[in-house]
UniProtKB/Swiss-Prot annotation:
<feature type="cross-link" description="Glycyl lysine isopeptide (Lys-Gly) (interchain with G-Cter in SUMO2)">
    <location>
        <position position="256"/>
    </location>
</feature>
<feature type="compositionally biased region" description="Basic and acidic residues">
    <location>
        <begin position="114"/>
        <end position="153"/>
    </location>
</feature>
<dbReference type="InterPro" id="IPR040052">
    <property type="entry name" value="RBM17"/>
</dbReference>
<dbReference type="InterPro" id="IPR000504">
    <property type="entry name" value="RRM_dom"/>
</dbReference>
<feature type="modified residue" description="Phosphothreonine">
    <location>
        <position position="237"/>
    </location>
</feature>
<dbReference type="GO" id="GO:0000375">
    <property type="term" value="P:RNA splicing, via transesterification reactions"/>
</dbReference>
<dbReference type="GO" id="GO:0005634">
    <property type="term" value="C:nucleus"/>
</dbReference>
<keyword id="KW-0832">Ubl conjugation</keyword>
<dbReference type="InterPro" id="IPR003954">
    <property type="entry name" value="RRM_dom_euk"/>
</dbReference>
<dbReference type="InterPro" id="IPR012677">
    <property type="entry name" value="Nucleotide-bd_a/b_plait_sf"/>
</dbReference>
<dbReference type="GO" id="GO:0005654">
    <property type="term" value="C:nucleoplasm"/>
</dbReference>
<feature type="cross-link" description="Glycyl lysine isopeptide (Lys-Gly) (interchain with G-Cter in SUMO2); alternate">
    <location>
        <position position="41"/>
    </location>
</feature>
<keyword id="KW-0539">Nucleus</keyword>
<feature type="domain" description="RRM">
    <location>
        <begin position="310"/>
        <end position="389"/>
    </location>
</feature>
<dbReference type="Pfam" id="PF00076">
    <property type="entry name" value="RRM_1"/>
</dbReference>
<comment type="subunit">
    <text>Binds SXL. Associates with the spliceosome. Interacts with SF3B1, SF1 and U2AF2.</text>
</comment>
<keyword id="KW-0507">mRNA processing</keyword>
């Protein structure tokens, strides 16, 4: 028997009416939500043509699946199959493969290095192009490039030509005459006046036979020339024999009245495979003129008696050939002798072509100026022979540049 058995307990549904209404409302809401979920699921199953979404397994997909598996069925269904509001139901979101990840290394350093190398390569190409353009302008202005003891073109051919000329002048081995000349020599009559002279005295002798002496003092003769030069130009005893058969005697000209050549012709080389024939007398005259010119010019010992810091270069370019690059190129070329303080180009109007343009170089040391004069005097520049000497330092500083040297 309980404590309150004697009390009457009224049982009525009015006190529980509010709770039952709320419960019924909850049940109705759950049913509506369940119906919406089932309807959406049925629509997705009908769209069989849509591809399944791609899942990136490397990005912790297992933890997401495990989380979804632990959730209730209706919540898991909502998480697995969300329908975005901004996309249609048929679109599928695929994550990008190259999505930026700050923890993952990239190619930034390689790209920067490649761009730096490309810029450096472009600068090198531009510098090389500028050098080539400068060399091209220099070659267009001068026939020979830079300072040189002799012109650059055909230097190898000139050396070969000089070597062959020295061999001929040394009187080397004689070339055997053709058999036709030997047979004619044997068939000559006994009374032929030059038969004995045409035959060599000995087989081992390579020098030419001296001409016969005649006892005719009144006979006019041309002045005798140097014997060694003729024999060297004639190429030895064979050519001498052939000329003697036609009546040639040393010091006399060919022909009946001796008006022909008294010395052999020679060839002067003009190009790689070309040349011109010059008379031996003209060659000897030209050599004599060259020797006289060399003797007239001031020797280097006279130039070096009064050295200064200023060097004067003449005959580098002719009148009207001065351009804007000449000063820079000359200064750069002379930097190898020592530091050049100043380079001045002065042109004298009305002067001869080899004296019109003067180039002054002021070195910081006298030793550098002496090196420049010794090395540059007599060199070729653009087909011209450079004249180098010293100039008064005081007159150079007051710009008195037209003094006679």
């Amino acid at each position: 028997m309980s404590l309150y058995d004697d009390l009457g307990v009224e049982t009525s549904d009015s006190k529980t009416e509010g709770w039952s209404k709320n419960f019924k409302l909850l049940q109705s809401q759950l049913q509506v939500k369940k119906a919406a979920l089932t309807q959406a699921k049925s629509q997705r199953t009908k769209q069989s043509t849509v591809l399944a979404p791609v899942i990136d397994l490397k990005r912790g997909g297992s933890s997401d699946d495990r989380q979804i598996a632990d959730t209730p069925p209706h919540v898991a269904a909502g998480l697995k199959d969300p329908v975005p509001s901004g996309f249609s139901a048929g679109e599928v979101l695929i994550p990008l493969a190259d999505e930026y990840d700050p923890m993952f290394p990239n190619d930034y350093e390689k790209v920067v290095k490649r761009q730096r190398e490309e810029r450096q390569r472009q600068r090198e190409l531009e510098r090389q192009k500028e050098i080539e353009e400068r060399e091209k302008r220099r070659k267009d202005r001068h026939e020979a490039s830079g300072f040189s003891r002799r012109p650059d073109p055909d230097s190898d051919e000139d050396e070969d030509y000089e070597r062959e000329r020295r061999k001929r002048s040394m009187g080397g081995a004689a070339i055997a005459p053709p058999t036709s000349l030997v047979e004619k020599d044997k068939e000559l009559p006994r009374d032929f006046p030059y038969e004995e002279d045409s035959r060599p005295r000995s087989q081992s002798s390579k020098a030419a036979i001296p001409p016969p002496v005649y006892e005719e003092p009144d006979r006019p003769r041309s002045p005798t020339g140097p014997s060694n030069s003729f024999l060297a130009n004639m190429g030895g005893t064979v050519a001498h024999k052939i000329m003697q058969k036609y009546g040639f005697r040393e010091g006399q000209g060919l022909g009946k009245h001796e008006q022909g050549l008294s010395t052999a012709l020679s060839v002067e080389k003009t190009s790689k495979r070309g040349g011109k024939i010059i008379v031996g007398d003209a060659t000897e005259k030209g050599e004599a003129q060259d020797a006289s010119k060399k003797s007239d010019s001031n020797p280097l010992t006279e130039i070096l008696k009064c050295p200064t810091k200023v060097v004067l270069l003449r005959n580098m370019v002719g009148a009207g050939e001065v351009d804007e690059d000449l000063e820079v190129e000359t200064k750069e070329e002379c930097e190898k002798y020592g530091k050049v303080g100043k380079c001045v180009i002065f042109e004298i109007p009305g002067a001869p072509d080899d004296e019109a343009v003067r180039i002054f170089l002021e070195f910081e040391r006298v030793e550098s100026a002496i090196k420049a004069v010794v090395d540059l005097n007599g060199r070729y520049f653009g087909g011209r022979v450079v004249k180098a000497c010293f100039y008064n330092l005081d007159k150079f500083r007051v710009l008195d540049l037209a003094e006679q040297v």
